[in-house]
Design a protein with these regions (language model features):
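Metal-dependent enolase-superfamily TIM-barrel catalytic cores that perform enediolate-based chemistry
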Residues: 1-91
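C-terminal extensions of enzymes
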Residues: 180, 184-220
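Electropositive phosphate-/nucleotide-binding environments in soluble metabolic enzymes
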Residues: 2, 28, 54, 78-81, ...
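Shared catalytic-loop signature of beta/alpha-barrel
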Residues: 62, 68-71, 79-96, 101-196
Length: 220
């Protein structure tokens, strides 16, 4: 993790997201290693992937580097919104709801308990149209948002980028890059420079499918 953090900072990335969830000791060591490697001027987001208990979350965010996080994404299991709310009210760090708010009904529960400061991945609720409904509801209740793409092809990432650029609620560093992908299905895959994607100026989503790749990679 430390070596990757140093490389990304050298490439110009100003915000790093640290994926956690092995165990509490490993997570704390990982956070410290990334912070030391990245330096004090780099913003950190941490994502425990629902693996922390309420007690662990409060302890981790009480560590010296804890208040330094931009936000902590979904620290506890998605169904335990009450614990998420208690963490949010006790923590000096912003709390983001991800898996806990995949649907309108789930978001309502998060809003009722004031369990988050922001939403992550509103597109997971069913596309751009549904995401706008989610964002409108979040806006009424004073929440912000961010978007995340970690395994999408260029088509899905392009949709996410349009949402990111057009919503006033999305005020955080964009969490998107190409991870784990060996191939794409568009003629010119999206590119990120220093963690930032270029603007899409072509019609529609701004990307054009490669018919031959779609045919070859399709599953029947």
């Amino acid at each position: 993790m430390a070596a990757t953090a140093r490389r990304l900072v050298m490439e110009g990335v100003a915000c790093l997201k640290v994926k956690l969830g092995v165990d509490a000791t490993h997570d704390l060591d990982a956070i410290r290693a990334v912070r030391e490697a990245a330096g004090p001027g780099i913003t950190l987001i941490v994502d425990p992937n629902q693996t922390w208990t309420e007690r662990t979350a409060l302890r981790q965010m009480g560590e010296p580097n804890g208040p330094d996080f931009l936000y902590v994404e979904q620290p506890v299991a998605w169904g335990d919104v009450a614990a998420l709310a208690r963490i949010r009210h006790a923590s000096p760090v912003r709390i983001a709801a991800d898996e806990a708010a995949f649907t309108h009904q789930e978001l309502m529960r998060v809003l009722e308990l004031h369990a988050a400061d922001l939403l992550v991945n509103p597109l997971d609720c069913g596309g751009i149209g549904e995401a706008w409904k989610i964002l409108a509801l979040a806006d009424l209740c004073g929440l912000e948002a961010n978007t995340c793409a970690w395994s999408e092809l260029s088509v899905g990432t392009a949709a996410l980028l349009h949402l990111y650029w057009s919503s006033p609620l999305v005020r955080y560093p964009l969490d998107t890059d190409y991870n784990y992908l060996g191939e794409d299905v568009v003629q010119v895959p999206l590119q990120c420079t220093a963690g930032r994607p270029g603007y899409l100026e072509a019609p529609g989503l701004g990307v054009q499918l490669d018919a031959a790749r779609v045919e070859r990679l399709g599953v029947r």
